[in-house]
């Protein structure tokens, strides 16, 4: 392929070879080839429809672009660093294939609005995939909740036993988080899904183009309303990476819990062998590498967000070469999020829950102490007085190396005369769980309601 620059008319000396390599983006933006060709086909058809270029040229351009697409997908296209980016590589090859007609393609268009279009087309498709992977993960969590509906586990605050809850309730907490992540992705898509083509370099174009026609061809519901803004901003990419950062934070929190739960100290869950690795020296080890890596990759996505924010933070309008640095953080975020979601959905689905370990732990650590306080309140004691009495009972148990379930009625009555025989039924783990019979609570019937709502898409 010829290495002549498509913008070289103003220059009298060739580009320095190191500068050529330093400024080229083809190594990473070649993944936009499909979007670039799709956008060019729509642009060419619009040019012909408007009488800006001959119709026979349009036919040659479209045919040539389809041939190039087939070449790229067959691995037969020779990408050139000397041609800088995916746009110039495709356009130069087109002109080489069909001659003068190929040189008419860029009429009424700049690389500035062209690349903005390519990124939006690409990100639009990727957001749809991310949402599909989120649906897969949510389905896996719901499956675990349904399979282990009655399993009781300790709920934690400060990583200390707090109150017993259903394991299914815990899974539904993450379902809610990932549903909000879906909402953020859907909302981001609305701002991504706007056509920038037609903005030109920054001020629009002198040709009588039809932007609405191009939008229709490319399935955009709207066109951008300011040419300068269209080529100057990447807030739509930033918004996606920000939403992805929150999503990865949720995955990281779940990762941390799975790592803790799978330790020999907890034994709450057993991750499938296919998602773990061993040690090169310790034969007994089964390491939770997948959640550990997802936890680590979360920081990578945070870094991508900060990288792009920093690129954009002080750029004057309109386009600046700094903005070439938008693609690698965006592409890396897309790859990281999709990979993490897919592997997590599969891992959660195959995870085994150790109900006996969870059940034993649920009753430890004075986990039903709040129920005792509530019991006293129902007997007429003010809550703060009830809290004080139960706190003293817990201190007594700690001193005597026992749990509150081991206390006799006589011992209970040391702390309040309001205690009677019905205290023993009130402080079982099962009673504690099912007493939380409020919307969003951990009572079994409420959890079943929420699973049903989730399955119905509410």
From Swiss-Prot:
Entry keyword annotation includes Magnesium: no
Top EC class of this enzyme: lyase
Keywords, sorted A to Z: Amino-acid biosynthesis, Arginine biosynthesis, Cytoplasm, Lyase
Cellular localization per UniProt: Cytoplasm
Record EC number: 4.3.2.1
GO biological process: arginine biosynthetic process via ornithine; L-arginine biosynthetic process
One Gene Ontology MF term: argininosuccinate lyase activity
Name this protein carries in UniProt: Argininosuccinate lyase
Organism: Trichlorobacter lovleyi (strain ATCC BAA-1151 / DSM 17278 / SZ)
């Amino acid at each position: 392929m010829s290495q002549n620059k498509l913008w070289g008319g103003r220059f009298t000396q060739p580009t320095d070879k190191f500068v050529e390599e330093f400024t080229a983006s083809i190594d990473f933006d070649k993944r936009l080839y499909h979007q670039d060709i799709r956008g060019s086909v729509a642009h060419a058809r619009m040019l012909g429809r408007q009488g800006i270029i001959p119709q026979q040229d349009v036919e040659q351009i479209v045919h040539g672009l389809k041939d190039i697409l087939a070449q790229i997908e067959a691995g037969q296209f020779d990408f050139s660093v000397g041609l800088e980016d995916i746009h110039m590589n495709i356009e130069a090859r087109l002109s080489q294939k069909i001659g003068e007609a190929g040189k008419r393609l860029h009429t009424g268009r700049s690389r500035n609005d062209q690349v903005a279009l390519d990124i939006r087309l690409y990100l639009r498709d990727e957001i749809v995939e991310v949402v599909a992977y989120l649906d897969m993960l949510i389905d896996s969590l719901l499956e675990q909740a349904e399979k282990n509906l009655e399993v009781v586990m300790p709920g934690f605050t400060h990583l200390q036993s707090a109150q017993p809850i259903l394991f299914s309730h815990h899974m539904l907490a993450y379902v809610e988080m990932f549903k909000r992540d879906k909402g953020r992705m859907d909302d981001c898509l609305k701002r991504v899904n706007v056509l920038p083509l037609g903005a030109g370099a920054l001020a629009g174009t002198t040709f009588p183009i039809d932007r609405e026609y191009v939008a229709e061809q490319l399935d955009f519901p709207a066109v951008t309303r300011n040419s300068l803004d269209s080529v100057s901003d990447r807030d739509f990419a930033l918004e996606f990476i920000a939403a992805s950062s929150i999503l990865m934070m949720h995955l990281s929190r779940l990762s941390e819990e799975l790592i803790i739960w799978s330790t020999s100290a907890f034994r709450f869950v057993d991750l499938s062998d296919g998602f773990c690795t061993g040690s090169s020296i310790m034969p007994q080890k089964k390491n939770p590498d997948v959640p550990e890596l997802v936890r680590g990759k979360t920081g990578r996505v945070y870094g991508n967000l900060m990288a792009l924010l920093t690129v954009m933070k002080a750029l004057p309008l309109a386009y600046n070469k700094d903005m070439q640095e938008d693609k690698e953080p965006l592409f890396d975020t897309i790859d990281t999020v999709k990979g993490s979601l897919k592997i997590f959905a599969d891992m959660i689905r195959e995870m085994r829950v150790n109900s006996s370990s969870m059940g034993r732990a649920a009753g430890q650590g004075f986990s039903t102490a709040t129920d005792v306080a509530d019991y006293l309140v129902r007997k007429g004691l003010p809550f703060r007085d009830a809290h004080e009495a139960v706190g003293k009972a817990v201190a007594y148990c700690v001193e005597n190396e026992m749990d509150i379930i081991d206390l006799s009625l006589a011992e209970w009555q040391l702390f309040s005369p309001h205690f009677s025989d019905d205290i023993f039924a009130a402080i079982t783990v099962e009673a504690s769980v099912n007493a939380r019979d409020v919307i969003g609570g951990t009572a079994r019937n409420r959890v079943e309601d929420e699973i049903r709502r989730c399955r119905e898409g509410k």
